[in-house]
A protein has these predicted regions:
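Transmembrane signal-anchor hairpin modules in multi-pass inner-membrane enzymes, especially those
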Residues: 1-100, 195-208, 254-263, 476-485
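Interfacial transmembrane-helix termini
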Residues: 45-67, 81-90, 99-123, 135-140, ...
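Transmembrane alpha-helical segments and their membrane-water interfaces
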Residues: 72-81, 99-157, 182-198, 249, ...
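Alpha-helical transmembrane segments of multi-pass inner-membrane proteins
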Residues: 139-167, 176-251, 274-276, 280
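A membrane-periplasm/extracellular boundary helix in multi-pass inner-membrane enzymes
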Residues: 225, 249-349
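TM-adjacent membrane-interface loops and short helices in multi-pass inner/ER membrane proteins
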Residues: 309-390, 405-409
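Hydrophobic transmembrane alpha-helices and their immediate junctions
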Residues: 403-445
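Transmembrane alpha-helices of multi-pass inner-membrane enzymes
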Residues: 440-448, 456-485
Length: 485
């Protein structure tokens, strides 16, 4: 984007970060890489660090720590002179328009979770700009991927050794909620699928790639025992996207063998490893005899019930929460309001079966729809029929409720562009950036699917949201498309 505003912002990044370049160049590349990997690992477990190390439970502390980590990542990613980059005009307008709407809403309605517009307008674009100027961006992405892989493997070891599986229940790994576990898993699945895509694209032999298949099988196993339906849909969407893209590429270059081989190997290894993994989670914690149980642990049963249910926790909120009463769904109901919002609410009425299948989400959607306005609300949560609901279980609806309807329209444009641009990125840069080319569309498509029934948007509260916002760094850069094959 060639506007004066974007040039001004990029010039600001150049002035602030250029003095660090000679200092960072004195540090060995291996050390810089390890620092980046450590920062991403810290960001992945940021919530745990704030809560159990700093003994805090606050959006403020998470945000401060997250911004600090982004600053460190930006500095240690410097390797040459910073220059202006061409940013995609449509995406830039939608992105910064969304940020402006968020900030305006924060100004008129003070929020418990404020400042998202500033973070997305100034903090993350600074890292985007540095990465776009780096001569080895593939290594930067490798540091992120390695951080997630290391964290996942550590989590798997702890889970197999100390987190027991209860018969008739849903497995949550090291988390207290299997749905939260599942949302992290779809991000991990996208990362390993990008490795599989690289293996297929480059014709890598199985003896050199078998660990990728084993770890993908482990992710699919965890998804299965967590029974997290949203995560299952996201994983299916990512897998279907990969198959479609590889089929389209096969029609272009007439290379089908590696794609079919990769898919069949994944299916075979998953089937073979599943009973082994299942036996591990059932018996190893009992053999060790030192199970790790948290005070917040809730046993979610396969039939939808839960023992000692305490609700999903997103932010620590102590003030009064806005309340709304929604009548129980009836089989038939006349709705006389003729507005678009009224007709939408009416279409949700009378659908008791769908409401049960979606675990009451229809009632939640109706409650949030009735509270929409142009300025937004102080909170994310809402009390529906006397019961506290953590969030809207839909990102578009949550943005409309928290930041106002105009902000939701900008976010809608952003999500559409993210899917289109990420697929374009893969199609034109799969060879140049083979090690992470599929990660970008995998993250974007998985996130859009997941946020149809869940709420993920604060980058330093939940890692899937961070990964989605962070993926825009490559989508912003127009010069990649110009230099593509």
């Amino acid at each position: 984007m060639e506007s004066d505003e974007m040039n001004w912002l990029q010039d600001l990044f150049i002035r602030l970060l250029s003095p660090w370049i000679p200092i960072v160049r004195k540090i060995q590349p291996k050390v810089r890489y390890r620092v980046l990997t450590a920062c991403f690992m810290a960001d992945l477990v940021l919530f745990c660090i704030v809560r159990y190390v700093l003994m805090k439970e606050s959006y403020f502390y998470n945000t401060v720590c997250g911004i600090f980590l982004m600053l460190v990542i930006a500095i240690f990613s410097l390797d040459k002179k910073l220059e202006r980059r061409k940013w995609h005009k449509g995406l830039s307008v939608a992105w910064f328009g969304m940020c402006i709407m968020f900030t305006i809403s924060d100004f008129f309605v003070s929020k418990k979770a404020c400042g998202l517009g500033i973070i997305l307008a100034l903090v993350l674009p600074g890292v985007f700009f540095v990465w776009q100027n780096n001569s080895r961006k593939d290594l930067l992405w490798k540091s992120l991927k390695d951080a997630v892989k290391i964290s996942f493997l550590l989590m798997a070891v702890i889970s197999f050794l100390f987190r027991p599986f209860f018969e008739g229940g849903r497995y949550a790994g090291i988390f207290t909620n299997p749905n939260t576990f599942g949302l992290y898993l779809y991000v991990i699945f996208a990362i390993y699928m990008s490795d599989l895509d690289w293996n297929v694209e480059t014709g890598k032999k199985f003896r050199k790639a078998w660990t990728t298949y084993i770890q993908l099988a482990l992710v699919l196993f965890y998804i299965s025992v967590s029974q997290a339906r949203t995560a299952m849909l996201a994983v299916c969407g990512i897998l279907i996207l990969w198959v479609i893209l590889r089929i389209c590429l096969g029609k272009t270059n007439h290379k089908w063998k590696e794609t079919v081989k990769g898919f069949l190997l994944l299916a075979l290894i998953t089937v073979v490893c599943y009973p082994v993994f299942f036996a591990g989670v059932r018996h190893i914690p009992n053999l060790i005899g030192h199970p790790i149980l948290f005070e917040e642990d809730v046993l979610y049963l396969s039939n939808g019930e839960k023992i000692e249910g305490i609700g999903d926790k997103v932010l620590a909120e102590s003030d009064a929460i806005e309340s709304v009463q929604i009548p129980e769904p009836k089989e038939k109901k006349e709705f006389k309001e003729n507005s678009i919002l009224g007709r939408l609410i009416a279409s949700l009425d009378g659908n008791s079966t769908l409401n049960k299948i979606s675990n009451g989400r229809i009632t939640i959607y109706k409650a949030y729809l009735k509270k929409l306005n142009w300025k937004g609300h102080r909170r994310i949560t809402l009390t529906v029929n006397g019961k506290k609901v953590a969030h809207a279980h839909n990102n578009w609806l949550q943005f409309a409720y928290t930041y106002g309807v105009p902000a939701m329209f900008f976010y809608l444009i952003i999500t559409i562009l993210s899917v289109i641009r990420s697929i374009q990125f893969y199609w034109t840069n799969r060879r140049r950036n083979a090690t992470y080319a599929f990660l970008i569309p995998g993250i974007c498509v998985g996130f859009v699917i997941a946020t149809m029934t869940e709420c993920l948007f604060l980058p330093f509260e939940v890692f899937p949201a961070f990964m989605y916002w962070f993926a825009f760094g490559d989508l912003f850069d127009n010069s990649l498309a110009e230099a593509a094959e």
